[in-house]
Amino acid sequence: MQTKQIFRWFLNTFVKIFGVMPFETLKPQVKSIVLNTKKTVDERLLAICELLETHIDYYNWVGFYFRNGSKEELKLGPYVGAPTDHTIIPFGKGICGQVAVSNQNFVVPDVTAQDNYIACSINVKAEIVIPIFVNGENIGQIDIDSNTPNPFTEADERFLEFVCKEVATLF
């Protein structure tokens, strides 16, 4: 067996056993999507959402929010998952709105324990939001909802920070 075939076999076996693709194997795919200039920025963002939602079993809703011009609000960008009514989120409201103000990652292991949480679905149990910075300015964020209680680890945070740094190069 050639090295490439062995790697493919190992990766497929890992995914079958654990139900998720390791973050390190997703990084080159994220980079490849970002570098694909044949697609629009929104198409690339959607492809990243699809990649994450497909390969990480506890990522049940994956989307991007971006600052809406000069307004103190976020506007929903590309996403995959259940439709949401939250297409505009004022700064400070909900987890996403808080990240727009704090410029910090926000990991919520149990959304029912959060006072300032905007419910998108009764199925959502946890959320993670990571800001996207361009030249030191918070321009948006990636938002992940999970139907699994407390699924996010430090590895998720580091991986999503990587994704956000790659996405930042599109702007």
Q: Which role fits each region the language model picked out?
A:
Residues 61, 129, 141:
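Short hydrophobic/aromatic beta-strand element in the GNAT-like acyltransferase core
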Residues 56, 119-124:
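Short loop/turn motifs at secondary-structure junctions and domain boundaries
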Residues 133-146:
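Sensory-domain boundary capping and coupling elements
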Residues 10, 14-79, 83:
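Intrinsically disordered, low-complexity terminal regulatory regions
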Residues 23, 31-34, 146-171:
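Juxtadomain coupling helices with adjacent low-complexity linkers
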Residues 126-133:
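A short, aliphatic-rich beta-strand micro-motif
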Residues 66-119:
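Regulatory sensory and allosteric helical modules in signal-transduction proteins
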Residues 2-5:
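Low-complexity, intrinsically disordered or signal/transmembrane-proximal segments
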